[in-house]
């Protein structure tokens, strides 16, 4: 390792080469997380509901979390999204257009006791799901 008066170029080159041993740097530069992300790096995405599914909560909890299978419009990928709120699943029907966003787990993964679910439903047919659950808005008839 040079540390002399004129060693700056070698120091800089070595530092740049060694950055690739940092997993986070390498994944960022190669765009691996964006490639693997169904939303392709976007904060939200729209999709069509294929079916309603119940996902069993992980131990020690015991519940069936109400989710929906969604096919994204932009790339055709299928993801599972959680319907947040008491009775929220009743406002979602098959073939509805929903907007989803990340559930907020660490490193873009799932959160809490819902295994394999990385997204939440925010809107159904362009109306906020939360507003419908609280009773402020009605689901539009198509």
From Swiss-Prot:
Function, in words: With S4 and S5 plays an important role in translational accuracy. Located at the interface of the 30S and 50S subunits.
Entry keyword annotation includes Ubl conjugation: no
GO BP terms: translation
Quaternary structure and interacting proteins, as annotated: Part of the 30S ribosomal subunit.
Organism from which the protein derives: Methanoculleus marisnigri (strain ATCC 35101 / DSM 1498 / JR1)
Official protein name in the record: Small ribosomal subunit protein uS12
Keywords: Ribonucleoprotein, Ribosomal protein, RNA-binding, rRNA-binding
PROSITE patterns: RIBOSOMAL_S12 (PS00055)
Molecular function per GO: rRNA binding; structural constituent of ribosome
InterPro entries named in the record: NA-bd_OB-fold (IPR012340), Ribosomal_uS12 (IPR006032), Ribosomal_uS12_arc (IPR022863), Ribosomal_uS12_euk/arc (IPR005680)
Gene from which the chain derives: rps12
């Amino acid at each position: 390792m040079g540390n002399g008066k004129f060693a700056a170029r070698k120091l800089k080159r070595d530092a740049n080469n060694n950055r690739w041993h940092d997993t986070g740097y390498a994944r960022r530069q190669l765009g691996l997380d964006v490639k693997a992300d169904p939303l392709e790096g976007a904060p939200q995405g729209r999709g069509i509901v294929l079916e309603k599914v119940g996902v069993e909560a992980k131990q020690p909890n015991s519940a069936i979390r109400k989710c929906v299978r969604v096919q994204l419009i932009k790339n055709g990928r299928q993801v599972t999204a959680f319907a947040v709120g008491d009775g929220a699943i009743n406002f979602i029907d098959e073939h509805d257009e929903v907007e989803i966003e990340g559930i907020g787990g660490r490193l873009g993964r799932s959160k809490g006791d819902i295994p394999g679910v990385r997204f939440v439903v925010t809107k159904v047919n362009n109306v906020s799901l939360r507003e419908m659950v609280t009773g402020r808005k009605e689901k539009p008839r198509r």
